[in-house]
Amino acid sequence: MKRGVFALAIVWLSALTIAPDARPQNESLRPAIDNERVTVWSLKASNGEISTQMHACVFIRLMPLVVAYFPKCSNEGWDAGVAGAVVIELKDHPVPPLANASGFPNAFPRPGGTKRLENDKVLVWDYTWTTGVPTPMHFHDKDVVVVYLENGSLKSTTPDRQSVVNDLSPGLIRFNARDRSHTEELVKGKSRAIITELK
């Protein structure tokens, strides 16, 4: 009997010893987007460390808004602020802009947009949509990464009048490939975005 109780005690103590090691460890932050052109990280206030290959990057903090370019990313120490931040790691895969044969103007520049920065890798725009004011029909000659800053809904309409409504929220990230034509209209709430065109 004593031997059985002793054996159970050993098993119980072993379980206590193993349990802490069995808890999930802090996993590496996974990218929100990863393709041949970019790796995009969404950071919260609680995590400022990412696994990066030390490429150039664009840093976007949502609040207070900061847009900055770094020739080499750091893999730690990002200040995500209270609302979070986005790091766009730029891979060594440049793609020349498409020749625009659509008959529509390029997506940028256009009214409502402010150029935040430009270099040989990116062109970054700060754009605000206005209720009741559709954008001109336009052509995207470059791949873009879009980071939305406000809650709202945008209706996107193609030249053949096909429409879709997208609900947007702060921190939402989208990668949109080039070779697209459409117009956009704010149909609900507000909408502002930092739009990074990839060269």
Regions found by a protein language model. Give the residues of each.
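Glycine- and acidic-residue-biased ligand/ion/polar-headgroup-sensing regions
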Residues: 49-67, 140-160
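Bacterial N-terminal signal peptides
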Residues: 7-17
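Positively charged n-region of N-terminal signal peptides that target proteins for export
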Residues: 1-4
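Surface-exposed beta-loop interaction hotspot
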Residues: 79-124
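N-terminal targeting signals for Sec/Tat export/insertion, comprising classic cleavable signal peptides
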Residues: 29-54
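Boundary at the C-terminal end of the N-terminal hydrophobic targeting segment
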Residues: 20-24
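Ligand-binding loop in jelly-roll beta-barrel domains
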Residues: 55-57, 72-93, 151, 177-199
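Short acidic-glycine-tyrosine-enriched beta hairpin
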Residues: 61-74, 161-179
